[in-house]
Swiss-Prot record:
InterPro entries: AfumC-like_glycosyl_Trfase, Nucleotide-diphossugar_trans. One of its GO terms (molecular function) is glycosyltransferase activity. Belongs to the afumC glycosyltransferase family. Probable glycosyl transferase; part of the gene cluster that mediates the biosynthesis of cytokinins such as fusatin, fusatinic acids or 8-oxofusatin, known for their growth promoting and anti-senescence activities toward host plants. FCK1 is a bifunctional enzyme that performs the first steps in the biosynthesis of Fusarium cytokinins. It first condenses adenosine monophosphate (AMP) with dimethylallyl diphosphate (DMAPP) to yield isoprenyl adenosine monophosphate. It then catalyzes the removal of the phosphoribose to produce isopentenylaldehyde. It holds the Pfam family Caps_synth. Its EC number is 2.4.1.-. Keywords: Glycosyltransferase, Transferase. This is Probable glycosyltransferase FCK3. Pathway: Secondary metabolite biosynthesis. Disruption phenotype: Results in enhanced production of cytokinins, including a compound which could be 8-oxo-trans-zeatin, an obvious intermediate for the parallel biosynthesis of 8-oxo-fusatin. The keyword RNA-binding does not apply. SUPFAM superfamilies: Nucleotide-diphospho-sugar transferases.
Amino acid sequence: MHFAIPLEYQSELEATEPVDVGTDEEIISSIEQYRPVTSEKNIWAFWDSGILSMPSWCKRNVIGWARICGADWTIRVLDMKPNSPNHVLKFIDRDMLPEAFLSGTMDGHHTGQHSADFIRGPLLHHYGGVSMDVGCLLIRHIDRICWDLLADPDSPYEIAVPVLYDQTIANHFIAARKNNIFIEKWHQLFLHLWNGRTHQQGISDSPLLGFIKDIRYDDATDFHWDWSVPVPQFLEYIAQVLCWQRLCLIRDTGDGFKSSEYWQRNVLCIDSLNEVWGGEKTLGFDGIGPRMYNLLTTRLDADPDSTAYKDAYKLVWRLLTRSSFQKVTRAKNLTYTPHLGTLWDQNEGKDCIPGSFGELLRYGPVHFRQKRENIEQLEASEPRTLIEKGLLEV
């Protein structure tokens, strides 16, 4: 189906053509193959049992990445399937990964998310590129989100990451040049915290994360997810984010690397509310999962004066014109209200019903190009108090 850009958005969008015109099956088949790393333009993702077993909406996300970014970027969805051409250990040395991950003995909640966390640092450090969660519905070309700036020798930026507030990042999208020392230290700390563990429970009790008791949530008021778990349990879910925070707070990691200074000077901070969670920004956080689910199933030929049509229209065109991507979260067993990813898991094909606003949201990123040259950025926040200890020093 062909969709036109409404007159009111023609100053913000222009028509373009997909850079990969292969069929969905051809794109998936290509991603399944082993491809040696030949550049830093790599998109790294993970699904334990392989790309073919991913939920269909996640496959469509990955196919969208290919249609938007084209052959200049190599997409790899790594896995832990025996004899797989994209097995994690074809790209990462064993000593860079926790034993529980290697032996398959992880027994806590969210093992899939933490498995993706384990491979993120080594891949970015050794090869460079972007680590992206398969729940990311990409809207803007990665070059235009951040990579052109990271590759510019006159730019100070060497890493790009969505930032919520202060030193709190969202780790579902991390872009970095290879051999980056900040990324190396980040993974070193995370690996240290997981040494001897099979689950994340209790990890927030580590003295290395003692700073979390002083975290202020004043600046978190823009983010209103309805968490149903105690704060310590949530913090353990985002343990890798806590490791990033520690690195941002340390003056010197013990070997002369000024990590807090590096954070403030060399990290491009993507405004996550505007660029990543545009749906939540537009509709509000209250019941956002069911609301987005229902709006994206709204038909394009519905009554244009109805509230559902107006809200769906506003949502989709806001995303297409002003977001870099929409992170579709699951937050399984973490919130009172199911998130959009969980609902799409449970309802096959509802993300792209023909003739719906969901289909338009799939079509737009591939066939429309944002005219804006720059994304919304935040300034890297200077820590209120620095940690005067080394990376692993208690």
